[in-house]
Amino acid sequence: MTTMTPTGVRRAQMQDAPALARTLARAFADDPVSVWFLPRQEDRAARLRRAYEQVFLRRIGLPHEATFSIDGHAGVALWLPPGQARLGVLDQLRLLPAMAVVLGRDLPRALRGMSAIDAVHPHEPHWYLWMLGVDPERQGEGLGSRLLVEVLARCDAERVPAYLEASTEESRALYLRHGFEDAGELRLPADGPRMWPMWREPRP
């Protein structure tokens, strides 16, 4: 299904993975969490692009049919639906070979970070916004909000909460405007950056 909604958002398909990965890599190139996971600047952009395409999009987001794009590939939101918002042990094991190829010697560091993030992840059924990224040249146009509204309207209609981790004060401010509230504290290991777990109850 590639039908575009009234907001200009469409459900992404597997063939969109390379373009969406480029958008995410550009959006998160200087993100403090991305820098922590991949500290070597010289090859960070290329490795981010490979990680988004080969791991997060092809193996996680797109198979769940809850990854959305807007204005072609200018913005992307990767959601995981209720009941699938946490990766089980077997899922994580299946991802390890692809992660090892992309992350190389940074794999142990990444696994520690993922473990810290998972430790505060709520168990109650919810929609999980794994990542939301907009091409830097298109930021400030409201594309992120339009991507958010697409699934948050469904959350409200189905009376299901939503959860995410914001990685910057700027993204946290966006999510606060859309009804999310702070839900505890999270800091990545080894004096890593702060993240903001956020929870949103469905609105009437």
Language-model features: where?
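A short beta-loop-alpha structural element at the N-terminal edge
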Residues: 8-22, 26
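Conserved GNAT-fold acetyl-CoA-binding loop/helix
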Residues: 31-54
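A short helix-loop-beta-strand connector motif used in the catalytic cores of GNAT acetyltransferases and
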Residues: 47-68, 122-128
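Conserved beta-hairpin
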Residues: 61-79, 135
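Conserved acyl-donor/pantetheine-binding loop and adjacent beta-alpha core of acyl/acetyltransferases
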Residues: 76-133, 139, 189-193
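Conserved GNAT acetyl-CoA-binding A-motif
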Residues: 125-128, 154-167
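Conserved acetyl-CoA-binding loop-helix of GNAT-fold acetyltransferases
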Residues: 140-153, 177
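Conserved active-site alpha-helix within GNAT-family acetyltransferase domains
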Residues: 145, 157-159, 168-185, 191-192
